[in-house]
């Protein structure tokens, strides 16, 4: 028993993981990545693509430390103490290049779609282990949207928060509760200090407001501001559809007339 206890203590001291982590997609980029000097954040991402293509890309480019699939499998990409290129143009509390002081976790899925509990549990267990290892409080477990920012462009004249909605669902109170996180960032220090401006008002409400569902106010029509409620053709179809009539199969279709023409198709504008 004493030998077992000593071995267990040695295991903890070594920083070895208690989670089953696969090295199948461990990146060949590890050898060229420098050791990270500090770890202040855990950044959660969504891949916005299926598992296999995401894992292949992450492995090839070394763009995350871990990837968690829909079935809860955890893959190591870049060793946790090395720099992974996951955050891109980023800022947190005045410090740029978040890659230099964070661990990045890619989660197979999409920023506006709920994840199954088997995946949520795997993310939760990994996050909790990393929190203990690096002494990271709940409010510094953030999503990519919290730290990414955009450079000035034709739609935004200043550096702005809103370049990415990646990982946005991990800011929602209900999802954070599932992850065992009791606190979240209270406000955007970089916007408050006027280092950045708000480029996506809907995203701001998700990250720091009370929005807790994608369905309640997610924009339906792309726009330069991205925070504006959309209506467009979908709303017109819903508003003009009548109840189905079994005797007349066309009765449920929206009624088009000179007085009630359908709206023109929305002009798609690239997001800032």
Predicted regions located by residue number:
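Hydrophobic h-region of N-terminal signal peptides that target proteins for export
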Residues: 8-17
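Basic/polar, cationic surfaces and motifs that engage anionic cell-wall
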Residues: 19-22, 110-272
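Active-site-adjacent loop/helix surface patches within enzyme catalytic domains
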Residues: 18-137
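Sec-dependent signal peptide recognition
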Residues: 1-7
């Amino acid at each position: 028993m004493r030998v077992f206890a000593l071995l267990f203590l040695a295991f903890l001291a070594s920083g070895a993981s208690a989670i089953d982590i696969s090295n199948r997609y461990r990146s060949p980029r590890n050898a060229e990545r420098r050791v990270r000097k500090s770890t202040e954040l855990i950044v959660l991402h969504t891949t916005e693509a299926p598992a296999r293509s995401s894992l292949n890309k992450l492995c090839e480019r070394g763009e995350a430390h871990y990837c968690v699939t829909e079935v809860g499998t955890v893959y190591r990409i870049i060793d946790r103490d090395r720099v992974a290129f996951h955050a891109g143009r980023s800022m947190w509390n005045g410090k740029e290049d978040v890659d230099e002081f964070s661990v990045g976790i890619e989660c197979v899925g999409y920023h506006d779609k709920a994840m199954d509990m088997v995946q949520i549990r795997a993310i939760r267990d990994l996050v909790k282990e990393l929190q203990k290892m690096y002494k990271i409080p709940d409010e510094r477990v953030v999503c990519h949207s919290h730290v990414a920012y955009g450079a000035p462009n034709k739609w935004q004249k200043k550096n702005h928060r809103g370049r990415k909605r990646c990982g946005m669902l991990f800011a929602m109170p209900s999802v954070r509760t599932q992850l065992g996180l009791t606190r979240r960032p209270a406000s955007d220090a970089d916007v408050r200090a006027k280092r950045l401006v708000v480029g996506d008002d809907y995203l701001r409400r998700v990250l720091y407001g009370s929005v807790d569902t994608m369905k309640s106010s997610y924009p339906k029509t792309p726009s330069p501001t991205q925070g504006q409620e959309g209506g467009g053709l979908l709303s017109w179809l819903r508003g003009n559809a009548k109840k189905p009539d079994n005797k007349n199969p066309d009765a449920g279709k929206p009624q088009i007339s000179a007085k009630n023409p359908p709206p023109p198709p929305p002009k798609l504008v690239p997001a800032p």
